[in-house]
């Protein structure tokens, strides 16, 4: 389609590379609310739904120093972050129920505790061959031109568990968010405390 051609032309200009076999990963989490239009423009697109305890997601967003945009303005309070999370997940579930989206779920908690099997399953879904170097992601992450994220320093570190289930330390501050997120906590299998 015309929009697809425009997108790839802009990508070629931005990266300085043209054509060839590439795998493009757009990791902006809020793109899940664009799953419908993305599927329409790129019907063969594969989606990776990165899950994490909803309270940890909201706490992490609240604690980040994001550049202010209309979306990031929702992270000034954990309740607003929780509302955005719940609405975004509602829209994702709607798209997933009415469109033939090809997607794979990855739980952060599983990724940090059982990295290799989780990564192998993800690569299989993406149709990417396994290479042992995959387990040394931090060597690639040390190339800052490849990563543009507020958490660059974390991406360059080995996989760690210190952010897993951090939210209970802030239970009082997250009380309002817990109410908003209750159905997502249950729906994604986090109601058992994991």
What do the PLM-derived regions correspond to, one by one?
Residues 33-36, 59, 116:
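Short N-terminal helix/helix-N-cap motif within the alpha/beta-hydrolase-1
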Residues 2-22, 61-105, 113-194:
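PAPS-dependent sulfotransferases, especially Golgi type II membrane carbohydrate sulfotransferases
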Residues 31, 55-56, 111-113:
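Short, catalytically relevant binding-site loops at active-site mouths
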Residues 38-62:
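Conserved phosphate-donor/acceptor-positioning beta-strand/loop module used by diverse small-molecule
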